């Protein structure tokens, strides 16, 4: 009937708060489930970034890292790293950190930013390494039936992540990992290997390869190729000379005895 409807309009006109309350209830009833309004104390979403995320330097050098964030009013910003820290510069939305005397081959730096009670972080990896200054393969030296191969890798760091490989033609004849070395200074490495060469091994190049494996970063350097030449050793040559001289002496003795025998037979005739 029209009476309840007219009464509703009358109440809304006489008491404006009733109409607004009814409107709020209607909107609340129509709102989808699982999407309540966020309380006023919820943390503000923000991001944290480090630049650069990966940096490689020579041992003993310094590094500058920049930590930026999108927090309107950060409560705190700090850097956690085992490396020694230097000067820190700050600006709106960023902090610049200086790391001194980097010597560990791989280190992490974490930048932590707290915003509205929530902490986020970003990470940079710092690698200290020195690629081999040179890789030198000495000319092979023949001793008996084996060639002595000697390879020099100079001024390399870290030695513990160095792999030295000798390649003859298309095949690897020797490879050694130097992971037992844990020094924190530049070093020179010499690898010596004896190679028994067969007839098919001559006239093929020998190359020494140096490789640093740094958790995904691979640094390579190689020597100039040296061809394995056929050579005579002094000991076999001397032995052959003695054998030939002995054979000649035997032949001369036999020949002289035969000649004397022939002459004796002729004189008797």
Swiss-Prot record:
It is found in: Cell membrane. GO terms for biological process: cell adhesion; cell-cell adhesion. Pfam families: ICAM_N (PF03921). Residues 1-20 form the signal peptide. It is a single-pass type I membrane protein. Its main location: membrane. N- and O-glycosylated. SUPFAM superfamilies: Immunoglobulin (SSF48726). Residues 260-269 are cytoplasmic. Keywords: Cell adhesion, Cell membrane, Disulfide bond, Glycoprotein, Immunoglobulin domain, Membrane, Repeat, Signal, Transmembrane, Transmembrane helix. Residues 21-238 are extracellular. The chain crosses the membrane at residues 239-259. Residues 60-122, 144-215 form the Ig-like C2-type domain. Disulfide bonds join 67-111, 67-115, 71-115, 151-208. Glycans are attached at residues 66, 76, 188, 221. GO terms for molecular function: integrin binding. ICAM proteins are ligands for the leukocyte adhesion protein LFA-1 (integrin alpha-L/beta-2). ICAM4 is also a ligand for alpha-4/beta-1 and alpha-V integrins. Belongs to the immunoglobulin superfamily. ICAM family. This is Intercellular adhesion molecule 4. It comes from Pan troglodytes (Chimpanzee).
């Amino acid at each position: 009937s029209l009476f309840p409807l007219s009464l509703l309009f009358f109440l809304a006109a006489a008491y404006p708060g009733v109409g607004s309350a009814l409107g709020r209830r209607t909107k609340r009833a129509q709102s989808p489930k699982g999407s309540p309004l966020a309380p006023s104390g919820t943390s503000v979403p923000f991001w944290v970034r480090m630049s650069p995320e990966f940096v490689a330097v020579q041992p003993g050098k310094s590094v500058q890292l920049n930590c930026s964030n999108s927090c309107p009013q950060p409560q705190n910003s700090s850097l956690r790293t085992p490396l020694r820290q230097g000067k820190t510069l700050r600006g709106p939305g960023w902090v610049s950190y200086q790391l001194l005397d980097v010597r560990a081959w791989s280190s992490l730096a974490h930048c932590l930013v707290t915003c509205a009670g929530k902490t986020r972080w970003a990470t940079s990896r710092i690698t200290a390494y020195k690629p081999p200054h040179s890789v030198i393969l000495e000319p092979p030296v023949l001793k008996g039936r084996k060639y002595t191969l000697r390879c020099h890798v100079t001024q390399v760091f870290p030695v513990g992540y160095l792999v030295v490989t000798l390649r003859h033609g298309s095949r690897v004849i020797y490879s050694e990992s130097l992971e037992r070395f844990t020094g924190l200074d530049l070093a020179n490495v010499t690898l010596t290997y004896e190679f028994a060469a067969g007839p098919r091994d001559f006239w093929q190049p020998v190359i020494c390869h140096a490789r640093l494996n740094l958790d995904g970063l691979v640094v390579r350097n190689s020597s100039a190729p040296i061809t394995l030449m056929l050579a005579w050793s002094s000991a076999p040559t001397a032995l052959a000379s003695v054998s030939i001289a002995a054979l000649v002496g035997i032949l001369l003795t036999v020949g002289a005895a035969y000649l004397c025998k022939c002459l004796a037979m002729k004189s008797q005739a």
